[in-house]
């Protein structure tokens, strides 16, 4: 029942799947040089360094990888980002298709709907086969202090060739098990901790690192809840800190060299100052939801206060996000600027692209919330079938005049995050998001169009409270 309804209700919201025949036409010219191709003599050879990638299980669109190595008694840290724009000519039909799709879509328990055709993805992804492959990358390179593990001296941005092989591609689980054995992982954790501590001086947003929610996984018997181990959480936080470091540097680089780009912003400094210093990650997440704090895409420079950076962009996921591709073209323009290249985007074009990225991202957030809701209802149904009852925890976040907005935060002993809303007229009771209520549930109905009656006992508990 749930899988059939998912195919009918949720999956279509992710849009049109890729068409192999059409993709063959789109990728006819991907091996041809174009205006923003980087010649081999301008690429730095980093194929001699071990390069590692850590991604979710089943990932084949690895945007990022890293190397940690010692040279001349100095410790270096390199973040390598895939370079798909090497194969994409601006204003081509391939580029138009990427702009139209804007992001890769990830329907649950289904294959992704990639933003890029498979040929470009395979050429760009920083994963290799068992023999290894040379891939093109844009690398952020910095020296690291051997004692504090903080980045020191000048940070460089390089166009590179890197060597990637399957043996160095890990899942978060695999990496968490081997982190003490692989020196690059061990040092990487220390570098990420130093980056986090530096950010903590500028934002309470680092408290979000504490938040860990269970999520559905799937096997032949259906959907089940899984909670990351401590080691998996540490590995995810490490990769996230690497991305924040790179995105912040590129944001600053674009500001200094162009004062234009597509920036990820969140104006929340004043609001963050109102929060007490001892706030937990879960409390902060609850406050963010209740107060409607969210990030924007903008073509002008503003700070991202939740991550604690005065300049911030999305640069590290170009295989799956249009915004990152745009940053890559701008970086290449800066590289070629001395050759009197024309700028790839006008101010008005950047503004339109930023608006598109924002609208598509927000629309997809709604689809993801629906997807999560649907799958968590499926999990609840399975748990009730096996055990007759479950316990859920919930709190009310607000009332719009027609809809009462609720967050389900616990299913049995698992922390979850599931939005739920009820159509209610003239709701006049006090709303306190800190008041979490727990109820026993014996019935869950498959989601159709509205949340109402999917968890009947929850509806009854809220309306009679």
Regions inferred by a protein language model and the residue ranges of each:
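Electropositive polyanion-binding surfaces
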Residues: 2-6, 27-464
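Boundary/activation segment at the start of structured domains
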Residues: 1-26
